[in-house]
């Protein structure tokens, strides 16, 4: 949705509350998922989505539904527009060229879990 494009996120963002939490474990988890590496990856995925005329949310949901071994894709939305972006993924298919670009980003900027 663009909320986490840099380290200055809106006060109502979920991770903003995690960073302000006094529990060191919660802060550590927040830093694991919102850091320079993940912000760089987010920017790369946003640019890729823009190149294909879709929102980053649509790209993420389309990526999840692309794999037949994923039984279901769980989405979350705070607004009707976010829900519409998720639903747009049902009309969007990831072709081989786009998948190669996604995999390049994944190779260049590794997922924070591994």
Language-model segment annotations:
Residues 1, 49-57, 108-114:
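A short, terminal or domain-edge coil/loop segment
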Residues 1-47:
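Glycine-rich, positively charged active-site loop/lid region within alpha/beta enzyme cores that binds
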Residues 9, 20, 31, 50, ...:
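Generic surface-pattern signal
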Residues 27-91:
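Conserved short secondary-structure transition element at the edge of the structured enzyme core
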Residues 80-83, 88, 93-114:
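Extended hydrophobic/aromatic segments used for targeting, binding, or gating
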């Amino acid at each position: 949705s663009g909320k986490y494009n840099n380290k200055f996120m809106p006060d109502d963002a979920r991770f903003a509350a995690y960073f302000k939490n006094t529990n060191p474990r919660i802060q550590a988890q927040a830093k694991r998922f919102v850091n320079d590496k993940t912000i760089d990856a987010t920017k790369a995925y946003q640019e890729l989505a823009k190149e294909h005329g879709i929102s980053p949310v649509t790209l993420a949901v389309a990526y999840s539904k692309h794999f037949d071994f994923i039984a279901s894709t769980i989405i979350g939305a705070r607004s009707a527009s976010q829900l519409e972006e998720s639903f747009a993924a049902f009309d969007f298919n990831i072709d081989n060229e786009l998948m190669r670009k996604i995999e390049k980003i994944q190779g260049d900027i590794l997922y924070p879990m591994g």
